[in-house]
Amino acid sequence: MNTDSGPGAPDTRGAAVWYHTFGCKANQYDTERMRQELESRGALTVDDVARADTAVLNTCTVTEAADREAMRTVRRLARRHPELRLVVAGCSSALRAAEYEEMPQVDGVVPGHDPVAVALAVAPEVHLAATDEEPIGGVLLRSNRRGSRGWLKIQDGCDRKCSFCATRLARGASRSRLPGEILAEAELQAESHAELVLTGIHIGHYGLDLGAGTNLSSLVADLLERLPGVRFRLGSIEATEIDDALLELMAGSGGALAPHLHVPMQSGSDEVLRAMRRWHTREQYRRRVLEIADRIEPLGLGADVIAGFPGERDEDHAETRALIEELPFTYLHVFPWSPREGTHAASLPDRVPREIAAGRALELREIGIEAGTAYAASRVGKLARVAIESRTSGLTGDYLRVRLRGANREPGTLEWMTLSGTATDLKAGAGATGRAALPVLEAAAAP
């Protein structure tokens, strides 16, 4: 790590900072908190890295490919912008801090997401002891500068022990924010965002550490009552943790709670689910998803799937494929398993050859794309309330991407529109997190 430091006061006044986020919506929120902290100390945020003197990279460690992508980005930025200071934070740096510190291109490493630690890392003459777990909440995020949708982080960390997951090692135990703090932040963000996404690492466990009567359903009910003009969307949530009260809120909200659920599946084989240390069976997942789909219509439905987990046989893969084909998914995030240091799965025998795992992942992605395209086609001619993300694009409540026709529209607003056109042809390729592109329809103002 480059430890050269220049003169100056231990603050960020005058620093021009460019941010890059890898990974999940929780990371997007954390980057915004870093930005807000730095701006409060006098730093300037820039959208062009060529204008920056410091870059903050908020990394992801969900897969081996995610770690590699972050390190490649460090080297590429250093090569193209040799005068740029590089500060690395996030989940990858939490688990691989020593590796980043050994990289000569890196000027500062923050093992985690603490925005104060990031701000101090930008001022190189200040040294801060590393912490494994930053506090949850405490400072309210006023807005999401980089998008028309706002991120509303309600908790961090996870108490489950899935054998494949390194994110829980990086994020620590589940910690919920107080409801009043979340409501106050939602009111601030609602001033500039018409849609707020409830995010975290394990939002289905929201409130378990806060005492009786506080849970995700009660929080959502309070948000819907407090901010009736805002559309709320749930981030990733386990299917078995969606209670009937939450379904009733979604069904009866008139779209104020977006009809969209991302419910991690991981595998359709009970043998593999046991090896993954998941807490549900294939049938429990299947039954709950079908109950949800029967109650909510239309419904954008996504899932995470891991292909090629250690010990996964052809028949296990076939069971996963069959379950995907049975359930009404509209998109999938699929990626081949990769060993994550410190996880139980990294020590399991019977690893599936990489080329077989990659082939299985590609096959499942193609099924997901076919399902998504068919779902998009079924929505043509329907009315949808679209969150305007830019003057030419938006997102429906059921998670369809749309191109906007007609007059330019104001980002950060909601508008009823008629869906039209044919879903754009998609490819089954995916990035480090296995995310496939969403189908794209066209939309025009409703008559």
Where are these regions (language model features)?
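Proteins enriched for Cys/Gly/acidic motifs involved in redox and nucleic-acid/cofactor modification
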Residues: 1-206, 245, 261, 282-294, ...
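Terminal RNA-binding accessory module
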Residues: 14, 336, 347-447
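Active-site proximal loops enriched in glycine and acidic residues that flank catalytic Cys/His/Asp
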Residues: 21, 200, 236, 265-267, ...
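Alpha-helix N-cap/loop-to-helix initiation residues
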Residues: 27, 63-66, 93, 239, ...
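Residue-level signal for inorganic ion chemistry
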Residues: 56, 91, 198, 234, ...
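Conserved SAM/AdoMet-binding glycine-rich loop
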Residues: 86-87, 95-96, 191-315
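Short acidic, glycine/proline-rich loop/turn micro-motifs
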Residues: 273-276, 344-348
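Contiguous mid-protein beta-loop-alpha structural module that forms a pocket-lining wall or clamp
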Residues: 312, 328-329
